[in-house]
Design a protein with these regions (language model features):
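Phosphate- and other anionic-substrate recognition elements at nucleic-acid/protein interfaces
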Residues: 1-143
């Protein structure tokens, strides 16, 4: 499948900024979306070309990755500690971050990180919750 568009996502709790670029770096579209399943699905469904997307791994990027992944030719998460181009820039805002992520994925320079399958992430979530409950029970017994 020939990928024609490269999309950079700057993910936040309540919004997602995006920038769509062609293979030569021309900006086709950019904007901000509300971070909800319905809005993201509708937006991704309207993308006409096969696209390759990337976002920085954050606390909120897991469910966004799961929502967008079926629509993308390829979707990756960038390792936050290794994405120095964004962190080191002097001029920072969400729009510019999305542009830089689109350029990084377009040039195939994304330091990708492992994204565990949904089942594994759900097991991890349950184990974290269990550890919390066990810790609270232990604190109560020790009072």
């Amino acid at each position: 499948m020939n990928v024609n568009h490269y999309i950079g996502f700057d993910v936040h709790k309540k919004s997602v900024n995006y920038c769509v670029k062609t293979a030569d770096g021309t900006i086709i579209d950019e904007g901000r979306l509300r971070a909800t399943h319905d809005v993201l699905r509708r937006w991704a469904g309207e993308r006409p070309e096969p696209w390759h997307g990337a976002m920085e791994a954050t606390l909120f990027s897991g469910w966004i990755y799961d929502t967008l992944q079926p629509f993308a030719a390829e979707l990756q998460m960038g390792h936050p500690a290794l994405m120095k181009a964004i962190a080191a820039s002097k001029k920072k805002n969400d729009k510019l971050d999305a542009r830089k992520i689109a350029d990084i994925v377009r040039c195939n320079l994304l330091p990708a990180c492992y994204v565990a399958p949904v089942e594994i992430r759900e097991l991890r979530r349950m184990l974290r919750y269990r550890n919390l409950v066990v810790g609270q029970a232990t604190r109560m017994k020790n009072k």
